[in-house]
């Protein structure tokens, strides 16, 4: 697999389209950090790490509104292995005028656009979530 983060986002997008309660993805440190951001920003209910004597599995519990409205409207991969996209500290993008979240890989770890702006760091723009 050439782009595991794109696979992670696609699995969430596909499960969200058919209103699945949970989705399982192969685990990694980056995916765990992305799941933590999704949870903290209120896009998923929870996630758990399952040990399987290999790389492990992340089980994400998706969140829906009272009338089955999707909380995650869209996920978009920005920086991919063939075309890396970087943003300086003053050029950090806003997603939908601040309604969405940009996930940025910085020297201080994987942060949301708001946290990166507050800490004054730039980095690689991984994805947009809205």
From Swiss-Prot:
Disulfide pattern: none
Pfam families: Ribosomal_S8 (PF00410)
Entry's Gene Ontology cellular component terms: ribonucleoprotein complex; ribosome
Molecular function terms from GO: rRNA binding; structural constituent of ribosome
PROSITE patterns reported in the protein's UniProt record: RIBOSOMAL_S8
BP term (GO), one: translation
Keywords: Ribonucleoprotein, Ribosomal protein, RNA-binding, rRNA-binding
Family annotation (InterPro entries): Ribosomal_uS8, Ribosomal_uS8_CS, Ribosomal_uS8_sf
Assembly notes: Part of the 30S ribosomal subunit. Contacts proteins S5 and S12.
HAMAP family xrefs: Ribosomal_uS8_B (MF_01302_B)
Function: One of the primary rRNA binding proteins, it binds directly to 16S rRNA central domain where it helps coordinate assembly of the platform of the 30S subunit.
Membership in a protein family: Belongs to the universal ribosomal protein uS8 family.
Xref: PANTHER family: 40S RIBOSOMAL PROTEIN S15A
Name by which UniProt lists this protein: Small ribosomal subunit protein uS8
Organism: Moorella thermoacetica (strain ATCC 39073 / JCM 9320)
Organism classification: Bacteria, Bacillati, Bacillota, Clostridia, Moorellales
């Amino acid at each position: 697999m050439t782009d595991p983060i794109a696979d992670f986002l696609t699995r969430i997008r596909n499960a969200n389209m058919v209103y699945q309660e949970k989705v399982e993805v192969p685990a990694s440190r980056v995916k765990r950090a992305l799941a933590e951001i999704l949870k903290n920003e209120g896009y998923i209910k929870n996630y758990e790490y399952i040990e399987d004597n290999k790389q492990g599995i992340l089980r994400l519990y998706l969140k829906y509104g009272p009338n089955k409205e999707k909380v995650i409207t869209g996920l978009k991969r920005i920086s991919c292995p063939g075309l890396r996209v970087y943003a300086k500290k003053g050029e950090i993008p806003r997603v939908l005028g601040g309604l969405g979240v940009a996930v940025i890989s910085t020297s201080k770890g994987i942060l949301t656009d708001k946290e990166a702006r507050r800490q004054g760091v730039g980095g690689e723009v991984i994805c947009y979530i809205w």
